[in-house]
């Protein structure tokens, strides 16, 4: 069964072009030009990945992203017409997993789609039974079910946040560099990410875990090196 991709962009030429390239890769595509149509699709259809334009008339792509994150954990890629840190950081902060700036190469977008889907599937249930649960100081990560609990309360994490936390816990006691996190999460399809990308995801993780940068209980910053979770 082919993966189902949602594409929302009011620029018909871009949406149609992305649809063409996705279908050439045998994906099932739900294409919409308005937020209203997209929100109806989200409520009634099974989606594996969403591609959302930030600048939509009426309801923005950021609002759609937030509504998706209220119920779903599948990857979200944001399309932005502005190459600014504010747009990118805002998207990542509210739950997006990746972004790409217009104009973009269709093949680059397809590569990112494949990378996000591969990572999401990998971390959603491929470990052996005796390796699928990570437990540490009140934190429980189930790799198979893609669920995370802190002090018996479930955390709502994006796929990228889940991956970062899993990697840090699997390497607890050791410093994990931003470069290694980049490689583990985005793989060979990593292109030109901002240096702030991992920082934003870490900050969002800390907020959800009620952790602080000054006196962290879980995620510690080792300045100039990376991040670690103490044993």
Curated annotation (Swiss-Prot):
Gene3D superfamilies assigned: 3.40.50.2300, 6.10.250.690, Winged helix-like DNA-binding domain superfamily/Winged helix DNA-binding domain
GO molecular function per UniProt: phosphorelay response regulator activity; transcription cis-regulatory region binding
Keywords: Activator, Antibiotic resistance, Cell wall biogenesis/degradation, Cytoplasm, DNA-binding, Phosphoprotein, Plasmid, Repressor, Transcription, Transcription regulation, Two-component regulatory system
Chief subcellular location: cytoplasm
Superkingdom of the source species: Bacteria
CDD domains documented for this protein: REC_OmpR, trans_reg_C
Pfam short name (any one): Trans_reg_C
GO annotation, cellular component aspect: cytosol; protein-DNA complex
Domain (Response regulatory) ranges: 4-117
Assembly and interaction partners: Monomer.
NCBIfam families in alphabetical order: vanR-A, vanR_ACDEGLN
Protein's name in the database: Regulatory protein VanR
